[in-house]
Amino acid sequence: RRQRARRRQFALLGLAVLLIVLIFAFRHLISTPQQSGADGDTGNSGTSATEEVKQVAKAVNVYQSVMYYQPVVQKYAEQNGIPEYTDVLLAIMQVESGGKLTDIMQSSGSAGLPNDSLEEESSIRQGCTYFAHLLSKGKSLDCDLDCIIQAYNYGSGFLDYAAKFNGVYSTELAEKFAEKQSGGNTIQYDNPMAVQENGGWRYAYGNMFYARLVKQYLIE
């Protein structure tokens, strides 16, 4: 009888251990996020890489070479507290490099470094950090998003300038700032948007078409 009782105890103990193991395994399975992206270190609450790309692609229409970096952009956007601007950052990357340059967001200058001195991920990290700074300053000055996007190209001083005009972006506002900063000097610019509007030129400071170039890759 004692042996039977012991066998029952061992059997019950074994079943209890097995049940605990199964419970932990199941909880781990449902709580582990799927990894995504070029470097495989960005998770998004169980969303697969393909699903993430489709979600962003609904808001932004850019080259596949840019979409390749979407998980990295999203990671640093989240670190800077601006995940909802991931699509805007991808559109900025499209205009800056088309996803084909090493300093992929052309952000070296905003960090006080020589141009084209950052590698891809460092460039994305700095680009996201800089945009977050512009976003914070722009909001404090009541500037709209187009002004903030234009400031990525012109520098944060454009936000101070725009704030004097109620912080509302316009083509004329961007042109006047570039005219002032360039001393009225112009250069040839063969972008189709410029060719259609003025025959193909811009002021020799930044790119007065910048916000509009970025916005053409965003799907409203």
Where is each model-derived feature located?
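Short, solvent-exposed loop/turn and secondary-structure capping segments
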Residues: 102-105, 162-164
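Short, charged helix-capping/linker segments at alpha-helix termini
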Residues: 77-86, 142
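Non-catalytic cell-wall polysaccharide-engagement segments
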Residues: 1-53, 60-66, 114-125, 129, ...
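Hydrophobic side chains within well-formed alpha-helices
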Residues: 69, 88-89, 210
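Short linear capping/connector segments at secondary-structure termini
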Residues: 105-113
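Short, functionally critical alpha-helical segments immediately adjacent to catalytic or ligand/cofactor-binding
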Residues: 83-100, 107, 127-128, 148-154, ...
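Immediate post-signal-peptide N-terminus of mature secreted/exported proteins
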Residues: 57-65, 70-79
